[in-house]
Amino acid sequence: MHVLLIAGGWSEEREVSLSGAKGIEQALLELGHDVEFVDPAKDFKNILLLAEHADFAFINLHGSPGEDGLIQAMLNQVNCPYQGAEPESSFLTLNKAATKTVFDHHGILTPKWELVCAADGCKGLQDLEPPVFIKPNSGGSSLGMTFARTAEELEKGIETVFSLGDSALVEEYTKGIEVTCGILDGEPMPLILINPPDNAEFFDYHSKYALDGAEEICPAPIDPVLTEQIQQITAKAHKLLGLTDYSRADFIISEGVPYLLEVNTLPGMTPTSLVPQAAKEAGYSFNELIAKLIELGQRKRK
């Protein structure tokens, strides 16, 4: 097949996207596909033309224009199949506040949170006080995320987030252990336990991508009953958000209770990223995972 590999883009996660695309391209070539690469930041105006002549588009974008559903909507214009969520579900899930509203409405536990708009700043906070996490309302890879122990740190953290966007999600600090659960073709995969470095407050950008980053253990050495509970929550959230093919849900376990933090519609796809790690434990090599995602993407268009 002629596969259009879409990576790069203009979000803060551009370099992560390009890094992951290298391994995907190698896998596609080894699977016997013809690969054409396009970076929306450099050749946006030709995407529809390229997609129209492709048999499949493999999306490896983080943030806009991939996780917000823009590229998917464009691919739908020319009926080019792709892996992952449709535009509407992508747009909904990238917005952390909207996603947490869905969790709250359907009884899925998530840490207490508030949405703060740039026009209001810290004055927009009604109930939460430090310690809290401050996150960009849209985005991933923990870019711009800060941990505030004091009111002064909270104000600085919100200012940092407002330099990246017009809204911030402030989330109550929940002490516990971090785990992640991927889902592939409707089936939850083995959990991964994440141990950030000793000097990290959370699973930040450095922990995710540096060689001396977090320790990741798969399968997670936690109680089987709790494991099954987290897998069930992952499947429920995946369905409620209208996601397809695959996704990854991030949790914090506090005193034996799992709290769902967020869901990723285009999770990292380097061979050592979390979803490929879990897929390997489930019996898929990296190349087999890529092949499976192509199969799932094509199935949706039939």
UniProtKB/Swiss-Prot annotation:
<dbReference type="InterPro" id="IPR011095">
    <property type="entry name" value="Dala_Dala_lig_C"/>
</dbReference>
<keyword id="KW-0067">ATP-binding</keyword>
<keyword id="KW-0464">Manganese</keyword>
<keyword id="KW-0436">Ligase</keyword>
<dbReference type="GO" id="GO:0005524">
    <property type="term" value="F:ATP binding"/>
</dbReference>
<keyword id="KW-0961">Cell wall biogenesis/degradation</keyword>
<feature type="binding site">
    <location>
        <position position="264"/>
    </location>
    <ligand>
        <name>Mg(2+) 2</name>
    </ligand>
</feature>
<dbReference type="InterPro" id="IPR013815">
    <property type="entry name" value="ATP_grasp_subdomain_1"/>
</dbReference>
<protein>
    <recommendedName>
        <fullName>D-alanine--D-alanine ligase</fullName>
        <ecNumber>6.3.2.4</ecNumber>
    </recommendedName>
</protein>
<dbReference type="GO" id="GO:0008360">
    <property type="term" value="P:regulation of cell shape"/>
</dbReference>
<keyword id="KW-0133">Cell shape</keyword>
<dbReference type="GO" id="GO:0046872">
    <property type="term" value="F:metal ion binding"/>
</dbReference>
<keyword id="KW-0479">Metal-binding</keyword>
<feature type="binding site">
    <location>
        <position position="262"/>
    </location>
    <ligand>
        <name>Mg(2+) 2</name>
    </ligand>
</feature>
<keyword id="KW-0460">Magnesium</keyword>
<comment type="function">
    <text>Cell wall formation.</text>
</comment>
<dbReference type="InterPro" id="IPR005905">
    <property type="entry name" value="D_ala_D_ala"/>
</dbReference>
<dbReference type="Pfam" id="PF07478">
    <property type="entry name" value="Dala_Dala_lig_C"/>
</dbReference>
<feature type="binding site">
    <location>
        <begin position="126"/>
        <end position="180"/>
    </location>
    <ligand>
        <name>ATP</name>
    </ligand>
</feature>
<dbReference type="GO" id="GO:0008716">
    <property type="term" value="F:D-alanine-D-alanine ligase activity"/>
</dbReference>
<comment type="pathway">
    <text>Cell wall biogenesis; peptidoglycan biosynthesis.</text>
</comment>
<feature type="binding site">
    <location>
        <position position="262"/>
    </location>
    <ligand>
        <name>Mg(2+) 1</name>
    </ligand>
</feature>
<keyword id="KW-0963">Cytoplasm</keyword>
<dbReference type="InterPro" id="IPR016185">
    <property type="entry name" value="PreATP-grasp_dom_sf"/>
</dbReference>
<keyword id="KW-0547">Nucleotide-binding</keyword>
<dbReference type="GO" id="GO:0009252">
    <property type="term" value="P:peptidoglycan biosynthetic process"/>
</dbReference>
<dbReference type="GO" id="GO:0071555">
    <property type="term" value="P:cell wall organization"/>
</dbReference>
<keyword id="KW-0573">Peptidoglycan synthesis</keyword>
<comment type="similarity">
    <text>Belongs to the D-alanine--D-alanine ligase family.</text>
</comment>
<feature type="domain" description="ATP-grasp">
    <location>
        <begin position="100"/>
        <end position="295"/>
    </location>
</feature>
<feature type="binding site">
    <location>
        <position position="250"/>
    </location>
    <ligand>
        <name>Mg(2+) 1</name>
    </ligand>
</feature>
<dbReference type="InterPro" id="IPR011761">
    <property type="entry name" value="ATP-grasp"/>
</dbReference>
<dbReference type="InterPro" id="IPR000291">
    <property type="entry name" value="D-Ala_lig_Van_CS"/>
</dbReference>
<dbReference type="GO" id="GO:0005737">
    <property type="term" value="C:cytoplasm"/>
</dbReference>
